[in-house]
Amino acid sequence: APKISKQYRMIATPWRALSVLDRFRPTSIEVSDKWTLTQAARWARRRGIGSVLFSHERLDDMLAGWLRRQFGVEAAVGALNRRLVKQFDVIVVTSDYSSGEFSGLGAELHKVPLGVDLETFHPSMRPQGLPTPQGDGVIRLCYVGRMSHEKNPELAMRAAMELHRRGLPVQMDMYGVGPDLQAMQEESRGCPVTFHGFVESRTEVARAYADSDISMSVCPTETFGLAVLEALACGTPVVTSNRGGAYELVDASSGASGFPNPSGIADATTALINRLGPGLRASARARAEQFTWQESAHTMLQIHAGLAERIARRPYWKDNLVDARSAHREK
């Protein structure tokens, strides 16, 4: 799996993975890669095994963001998705937004929201009695995630800079590393923006959320938004864009949303600032409690069990091959 950038690896020899599957002999398979491992669906079909594609990204919006253009992307992604629907028995998505690219293709779609660790990410990570905002009146904002344009960290930063320009007392704390970090550091000079780098401990990540008054998770092409749930679980309300999977997680009781531009996010943040307090933090936690890993895992196991029951598993093809060779030698 060679690196194709500082952030990502790609499986270059997928047939080696299929060889491992032959030894493992699964009753169903689940694939999370739309590029290099889709041939696993053909492998499964030849053996009478059910196949699930877990779609973690919306390719049309993601590629349009990378290429900085929409023209030609929808047609290419549409062709790929039609092929995926034919290859896999089931497509799993995490949100209504992420299901959109499979609309009208005849896919067997299942929406399975992800979950959050409600014990690690907990309001108790915030010092007891700490007001929101704190005594100095500064509104503490945070962004937790990769400093890479597909996550739109620069939008969160620019919204904080816009709030500062409007005269609001804010402090933006950015946690994470990535290819856009240096450019963002240079752009935010002179503004109340602090970059803390990579945070290794999940406990420290939870503390970063809990110590903040508002978490900014504003990517409009996020198919779900684990960072949203982690912040909410810590009792921290969230500002997000008014489209995308993260938008589906943040309701009126737990945060706010705005147009995905610095002014729109700043407006949403300003409206949320006026609602800060213990009640909002309690509502944020209650919203996160609706999403558990136990429920996600249970739903996925049901999908796999259903596939195993309804797809008549053919005899294992290598066993047949061995039997045929033995019969030939006996002759």
How should these model regions be labeled?
Residues 39, 46, 59, 73-90:
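Membrane-proximal helix-turn-helix segments that form the acceptor-binding/catalytic region
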Residues 251-263, 270-277:
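Conserved acidic donor-binding segment of nucleotide-sugar-dependent glycosyltransferases
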Residues 97, 115:
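Carbohydrate-associated surface elements
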Residues 21, 85, 198, 207-212:
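Short alpha-helical donor nucleotide-sugar binding micro-motif in glycosyltransferases
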Residues 131-161, 173:
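Conserved donor-binding/catalytic core segment of Leloir-type glycosyltransferases
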Residues 220:
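Aromatic "clamp/platform" in nucleotide-sugar-dependent glycosyltransferases that forms part
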